[in-house]
Every structure is written in structure tokens, then in C-alpha cells.
Swiss-Prot record:
<dbReference type="InterPro" id="IPR027417">
    <property type="entry name" value="P-loop_NTPase"/>
</dbReference>
<dbReference type="Pfam" id="PF00493">
    <property type="entry name" value="MCM"/>
</dbReference>
<dbReference type="GO" id="GO:0000727">
    <property type="term" value="P:double-strand break repair via break-induced replication"/>
</dbReference>
<dbReference type="InterPro" id="IPR018525">
    <property type="entry name" value="MCM_CS"/>
</dbReference>
<keyword id="KW-0347">Helicase</keyword>
<keyword id="KW-0235">DNA replication</keyword>
<keyword id="KW-0378">Hydrolase</keyword>
<dbReference type="GO" id="GO:0042555">
    <property type="term" value="C:MCM complex"/>
</dbReference>
<dbReference type="InterPro" id="IPR027925">
    <property type="entry name" value="MCM_N"/>
</dbReference>
<feature type="binding site">
    <location>
        <begin position="340"/>
        <end position="347"/>
    </location>
    <ligand>
        <name>ATP</name>
    </ligand>
</feature>
<feature type="region of interest" description="Disordered">
    <location>
        <begin position="661"/>
        <end position="690"/>
    </location>
</feature>
<dbReference type="GO" id="GO:0003697">
    <property type="term" value="F:single-stranded DNA binding"/>
</dbReference>
<feature type="compositionally biased region" description="Gly residues">
    <location>
        <begin position="672"/>
        <end position="682"/>
    </location>
</feature>
<protein>
    <recommendedName>
        <fullName>DNA replication licensing factor MCM3 homolog 3</fullName>
        <ecNumber>3.6.4.12</ecNumber>
    </recommendedName>
</protein>
<dbReference type="Pfam" id="PF23191">
    <property type="entry name" value="WH_MCM3_C"/>
</dbReference>
<keyword id="KW-0238">DNA-binding</keyword>
<dbReference type="GO" id="GO:0006271">
    <property type="term" value="P:DNA strand elongation involved in DNA replication"/>
</dbReference>
Length: 768
């Protein structure tokens, strides 16, 4: 846009008056001095200060920035030259950027409409692509050997605010037709780079493609951000003509010409805590049932799975990340995988994480590729230059990645996330680009067993079918089984029926996991933090007593609690907790080495030791403590033992003690109740997580599973399909540390026959 000299001078005087008056009590004059001292060439002006000085000027800068960018630059350059005449070379000027509140002009890429073209806007989003930094010629110098004269020429494109655009062709002859030689060393260039900015994933409209806007940055703004960074960019929104000259199609490409780039905190959309919120958080952290309370508050529409819900709470809280002086990075994020039969609410748990976690990105195994999860090098359609494009895990930096149907992913694509899950970085070395991007995220995956349904006669490792190199990167691996028990099925059906009958006063359906479930918390910041008891929703048979009427937090308060504990509490290990962790890890290693019943779901490696530390730290965060105590380690071991041995166990010593007690009780009272013994925090609300033991023969669920595993391994190893009961009894007692009585063997075989897994006739057991 061409502006007459009088208007330019008037605009320049307005900015000089602003700098002279300096409403910030010397702030801008000091900023100019610092800029001159540090050899920088950009001054950032706050819009609030400009409004306080001259409201009309601030409005005109936003509405028609093309008229004011160069006068503002000239004014600042004049002030800088007065401070230091040698600061700027001939033809150089100080660039100006803007910051502060922009009102309606603070938008996301989805809100950028044609009405904003030609105005200054502040756009917030996440960087998805970055081009290489290229030089752009500003002034070319040519020498004529015939006349001995130098000829210079300036170049301006559509992105320039100074004058009209010029051609981009180098002159080869002067006005008299003499040949010219370009003096490249005397030419002037400036750096430029193209970014692609996309709206943040958590604010994307469901069912719609995310919107993207191209951003052009120049000079000192290049390389100020990388893919995966959340940024706020202030610039002028412009429409550029198409590549073909003389195009009359009316379709233009829009870009944002940036003058200020600010990196946003990952928690830019953090909730606001009131004094009452902090008081209630401390009250909840002091309760003895804090762990159960948060677990029950997560996904209340899902029946049971209390231990898995507890693990998800710890995953969202995470441990403490450590970066040592020698460059070693110790991750604090927790990775978790669920493997089990279909229709056991694995995917629903992932959706619950999407609703609660501040930043969560969902993907599927079949719909994702290795480069789509990590990063890719792509080619620009117009210029053909290479670009680095961030994948889902880079975009979810400091968040959670939910991967459903993990077993459907190709092996090559699955290997691509090995580095992310342990080192938490994505390293790219292809097409001449070598880069390392941060991907500090937790991974929660759901998968089906290799045979579709879980085969209890096989070991967990054979059912899962994934390599140990990948399994060891998961801190927790849960086996979720669909058990056929009439009592459990009745309770689940009642729970599902209550959800379908639960309606609002006007007859509409009410959401259980979203804000509708916490509607009493919407209108008042000091509203109750617990979900109001509803007879239709919660039922009448409440096994956990009267207090269970208020045993679920509202979704809004649960988000606040998790965000506060995750980001503002950084616990450290105490000596007592460290000793207990070392002892427990040694016992876990010893137990896995001596296991004869197929072992657990995960190999016990050095990564398991770090898992215990991360889980203990997450539990300390949940209790809002700044130190990790022995009780936190014990709670972490309960979750870890349940994940490894899929039983509600406490410490391994207590598990062995219970086996001895049940064995002694069986000798004295054949009809006594055995079953499974509740560990810390076990709940009658959680039947799907625990195999139901026998009440008649006093055989624990663990011994039943160990028996079935021994029988399955023996049958597969010897390629036989039938055995006598005497042979089975001798075999299991030979392989097991605790012997089985004849009545216990017959009872377990009858259970297997009822499940159509074996057929017994005349003392011979045939494997089906």
C-alpha cells in the first residue's frame, strides 16, 4: 500500500510522542537501550500501553496495520540512532512487534475469516510444520566492467509493508545495454521461513478437520519455534495472489505476516483455583480413601475396574521428570496398556481419559502410521522444499496419547514409538534434515489378545503376542477378562439399565461423564464438589455404607484436582521409601525367577524399578505431599502387583502368608470360606477385576489359575489331549510349591468341565 509522505510523517510523530511520553515510566526507553546494548533489532510494543496513550491510534493500528508498521519502525529507529549513531547501518531499521490483548482480534485458525484480511490479529495454535530457513534478497548490487559503475536495486514482495511490490528478476544489462556482473558479497539478504499453525487438539471441533494457517516469519523470528510448540503469533492477515499470473479465478491464498512470536505454556488453558478449591483439595488429600475416591470418580458410567481406574489416575498425575547434569533424561510419564476380551470397556476408559486429561490426543492402531505418530518429512506443494511435520505424539507433548486397537498396528509402525516411550524424543534423520523433537507424553493403549479372546491355558505373554522390548516400556499392563458369573452379570445389567433410565427433569438424557454429570458445579464456583446422590443412577444396594452417597467427585473438580497435583506438587524420595523400593524390587525379581505358573504379564527388569518410583511419586502427588513415604510405595506396589499378577494383592510377603493361612484352614474346616482376600482398597464394586474363588473347596482363585496354567503348559509341551486324574494330580504336585489335595484337583477339573474346557469320563480328562 502506497502512503503519501504527509501521512507517513504524521504517523511517525504519533509513535515518537508515544515513546517520548512513555506511559510505562521509562519502560520503552529502557527497552530501546537494552535492544541497542544487546544488538537486537526488534522492539515489542504493548497494546495496553498504546491504548492508554492514544486509543484512536491503537484502534487504527489493528484495523489498518499496513499504514503504521513502517512509521512505527522509523520512529523506533530514530530513537535508537539518537542513543547510538553506530547502532544501525545505512538503510537498516529497527522492526516493531506488538503484544497484549487484542479483544475480538484474538482468534484461533478456525476463527480466521475473510473479515480479518488486512487487519492485525493474534492467533493461537500449535506449530505442525516448519520449512527450512532460506535467504531472501533485499538489495542486489551489480558492477559494470565497461563504465566501472555500480548499480543497486531493491526488491519487495507482497509481504512487505514498504511501497509497492517489485519484480524479482535480476538486471543483466544497464540502461545503455552494457553487461552487468552481480556482486554477491555486497548484496543484502534476510532470512525467511514458513510455518504451518493448527488449532490445538483439545479445542478442535469434533468430527471436523483441524484448520491450519500458514505463517511467514522473517529476520530474527526464524527458528524461534519448532513443530509441537504452542505459540501465540501476532501479525497481519493478508491475501496473496495465485502462482499463475493474470489469474482471474478469484481464489487467493491467505498467510499471516508475523511481527511477534510468543511461546505459550503447555498449561495456557489451566483452570482457575479459588481459595475454597485449595481448601477442599487439602481436605480430600487428608482422607484415608483418597485413592478410592478418585478412582470411583473416573468414568462412573463404567462398572467395576477400580484398580484400572486407580492406575489411570496415577497415569494422569505422572511422576517427576529428571534431567541430570550429564545429559541423562529420566522420564516421569507413566505408560499403560490394557489387554483383554472384547466388550470389557477398554475403549470407554480411553474416552474417559480424553474427557479428564487437560491435553489428550486419540488415535487408533489401524488408522495410524509410524510417521503419523512421530514425525515426517514432507514436500511443500508450491515450492517443493522439505518440511518437518509433527506427529500425534509430538503434538501431545506434556499430555496423554490414547491408542486404541494397539494390536492391529503394523510391526514397523509399532517399532517407531519405542524411542518415544522411553527417551521421550523423536529423532529424524532423512532427506537432509536431522532434528530431535520433544514428545514428553504418557501412552495408554488398549488391545485384544492374539486369539481374539484371552486363553487362560496360555501364559500372559503368549496371549498378548507383543515383543518384550515393547512390553517392558509399559509401566503397567492389565489383563481385563470377561468373566461368566451370574451374580456379576446381574450387577452389570442393573448398572447399565440404571444408566439408560437416568434422565433429566425435562425428560432428556443426561451425560454421565461430561459436564452434564456435574451440572451442579457449573453455576457456582463454590458449589459442592461431590456428585449429588441419585437413587435411579446409583441404585439402592450400596455395599460401602452410607458414605457412598458422596463418593464421586464432579468432573470439573476432578480436573482441577488432577491439574493442581500434577503441575504444582513435585515430591522427592525419602530414605525410608528408597530402601523399601529397593527391597520390593529385589523380591519382585526373585518371585519372577522362581515362578512356575507362567509368571506375570510383564517381565521384571530394571525398568520395573523405575516404574515403582514413578507410581510412588504419583501417589504422593495425589496426597499433595512433597515427600514420597513408605505408604506411597506400598500403594504403588498394590497397583503394580495387580497389573503383573492380575489379582488384588498387597505385598508379596502378605500374599504368601495368605496362602499358608488358607492351607491351614482347609485342613481344619473343609467348608470354610476361602475365596480371594481383599487387599488394601478392594471393593465390592469391582468384581470384573478379580477371578472368583471357590467357596466349597477353599481353593483360592490364584491357585485355580496356577493349576490351569500348569495343565495347559504340560498338554502343549507333550502334545497330548487326555490324561487321567491321577496323572494330573501327580504332575501339578510335582511342579507346584504348594500341593493340591485330591478333592481340590477334582473340584478344579469340574469347574473346567462346566466351562466346556475339559471333558471328564471314567477318571480320564480329555482336553477340549
Amino acid at each position: 500500500m502506497e502512503i503519501n509522505e504527509e501521512a507517513m510523517a504524521a504517523h511517525k510523530r504519533a509513535f515518537l510522542d508515544f515513546l517520548d511520553q512513555d506511559v510505562g515510566k521509562g519502560v520503552y526507553m529502557q527497552a530501546v537501550r537494552d535492544m541497542v546494548q544487546n544488538k537486537r533489532h526488534r522492539l515489542i510494543i504493548g497494546m495496553d500501553d498504546l491504548r492508554n496513550h492514544n486509543l484512536d491510534l491503537a484502534r487504527r493500528v489493528i484495523r489498518t496495520p499496513g499504514e503504521y508498521m513502517q512509521p512505527a519502525s522509523d520512529a523506533v529507529s530514530e530513537v535508537a540512532r539518537n542513543l547510538d549513531p553506530k547502532f544501525l547501518k545505512e538503510g537498516e531499521r529497527v522492526m516493531v512487534g506488538f503484544s497484549g490483548p487484542f479483544g475480538f482480534h484474538r482468534v484461533t485458525p478456525r476463527d480466521l475469516m475473510s473479515s480479518f484480511i488486512g487487519t492485525m490479529v493474534c492467533v493461537e495454535g500449535i506449530v505442525t510444520k516448519c520449512s527450512l530457513v532460506r535467504p531472501k534478497v533485499v538489495k542486489s548490487v551489480h558492477f559494470c566492467p565497461v563504465t566501472g559503475d555500480f548499480l543497486s536495486r531493491e526488491y519487495r514482495d507482497i509481504t512487505s509493508f514498504v511501497g509497492l511490490p517489485t519484480g524479482s528478476v535480476y538486471p543483466t544489462r544497464d540502461d545503455n545495454g552494457n553487461l552487468l556482473v552481480t556482486e554477491y558479497g555486497m548484496c543484502e539478504y534476510k532470512d525467511h521461513q514458513t510455518l504451518s499453525m493448527q488449532e490445538v487438539p483439545e479445542n478442535s471441533a469434533p468430527g471436523q478437520l483441524p484448520r491450519t494457517v500458514d505463517v511467514i516469519v522473517e529476520d530474527d523470528l526464524v527458528d524461534c519455534c519448532k513443530p509441537g510448540d504452542r505459540v501465540s503469533i501476532v501479525g497481519v492477515y493478508k491475501a496473496l495472489p495465485g502462482k499463475s499470473k493474470g489469474s482471474v479465478s478469484g481464489v487467493f491464498r491467505t498467510v499471516l505476516i508475523a511481527n511477534n512470536v510468543s511461546l505459550l505454556n503447555k498449561e495456557a488453558n489451566a483452570p482457575v483455583y479459588t481459595r475454597e478449591d485449595l481448601k477442599r483439595m487439602k481436605e480430600i488429600s487428608r482422607r484415608n480413601d483418597t485413592f478410592d475416591l478418585l478412582g470411583n470418580s473416573l468414568a462412573p458410567s463404567i462398572y467395576g475396574h477400580l484398580w484400572i481406574k486407580k492406575a489411570v489416575v496415577l497415569l494422569m498425575l505422572g511422576g517427576v521428570e529428571k534431567n541430570l547434569k550429564n545429559g541423562t533424561h529420566l522420564r516421569g510419564d507413566i505408560n499403560m496398556m490394557m489387554v483383554g476380551d472384547p466388550s470389557v470397556a477398554k475403549s470407554q476408559l480411553l474416552r474417559a481419559v480424553m474427557n479428564i486429561a487437560p491435553l489428550a490426543i486419540s488415535t487408533t492402531g489401524r488408522g495410524s502410521s509410524g510417521v503419523g505418530l512421530t514425525a515426517a518429512v514432507t514436500s511443500d506443494q508450491e515450492t517443493g522444499e522439505r518440511r518437518l511435520e509433527a506427529g500425534a505424539m509430538v503434538l501431545a507433548d506434556r499430555g496423554v496419547v490414547c491408542i486404541d486397537e494397539f494390536d492391529k498396528m503394523n510391526d514397523q509402525d509399532r517399532v517407531a514409538i519405542h524411542e518415544v516411550m522411553e527417551q521421550q524424543t523423536v529423532t529424524i534423520a532423512k532427506a537432509g534434515i536431522h532434528a530431535s523433537l520433544n514428545a514428553r507424553c504418557s501412552v495408554i493403549a488398549a488391545a485384544n489378545p492374539i486369539y481374539g479372546t484371552y486363553d487362560r491355558s496360555l501364559t500372559p505373554t503368549k496371549n498378548i503376542g507383543l515383543p518384550d522390548s515393547l512390553l517392558s516400556r509399559f509401566d503397567l499392563l492389565f489383563i481385563v477378562l470377561d468373566q461368566m458369573d451370574p451374580e456379576i452379570d446381574r450387577q452389570i445389567s442393573e448398572h447399565v439399565a440404571r444408566m439408560h433410565r437416568y434422565c433429566t427433569d425435562d425428560g432428556g438424557a443426561r451425560s454421565l461423564d461430561k459436564e452434564g454429570y456435574a451440572e451442579e458445579d457449573d453455576g457456582d464456583a463454590n458449589a459442592a464438589i461431590f456428585v449429588k446422590y441419585d437413587r435411579m443412577l446409583h441404585g439402592q444396594d450400596r455395599r460401602r455404607g452410607k458414605k457412598s452417597k458422596q463418593d464421586r467427585l464432579t468432573v470439573k473438580f476432578l480436573k482441577k484436582y488432577i491439574h493442581y497435583a500434577k503441575n504444582l506438587i513435585q515430591p522427592r524420595l525419602t530414605d525410608e521409601a528408597s530402601d523399601h523400593i529397593a527391597t520390593s524390587y529385589a523380591e519382585l525379581r526373585d518371585g519372577s525367577a522362581n515362578a512356575k505358573s507362567g509368571g506375570g504379564t510383564l517381565p521384571i527388569t530394571a525398568r520395573t524399578l523405575e516404574t515403582i518410583i514413578r507410581l510412588s511419586t504419583a501417589h504422593a502427588k495425589m496426597k499433595l505431599r512433597h515427600e514420597v513415604l513408605k505408604s506411597d510405595v506400598e500403594a504403588a506396589l498394590q497397583v503394580l502387583n495387580f497389573a503383573i499378577y492380575h489379582k488384588e494383592l498387597t505385598e508379596m510377603e502378605e500374599r504368601e502368608q495368605r496362602e499358608m493361612e488358607m492351607k491351614q484352614q482347609a485342613d481344619h474346616d473343609a467348608g470354610a470360606t476361602g475365596g480371594t482376600v481383599d487387599g488394601h482398597g478392594s471393593s465390592g464394586n469391582d468384581p470384573m477385576d478379580v477371578d472368583v474363588g471357590s467357596n466349597d473347596q477353599n481353593v483360592s482363585a490364584e491357585r485355580i489359575q496356577a493349576f490351569e496354567a500348569l495343565l495347559g503348559q504340560h498338554v502343549l509341551a507333550n502334545h497330548i489331549d487326555q490324561m487321567s486324574i491321577d496323572e494330573i494330580e501327580q504332575m501339578v504336585n510335582r511342579e507346584s510349591t504348594a500341593p493340591y489335595t485330591r478333592s481340590q484337583v477334582e473340584f478344579i477339573l469340574e469347574r473346567m468341565q462346566d466351562a466346556n474346557r475339559v471333558m471328564i469320563r471314567d477318571g480320564v480328562v480329555r482336553i477340549i
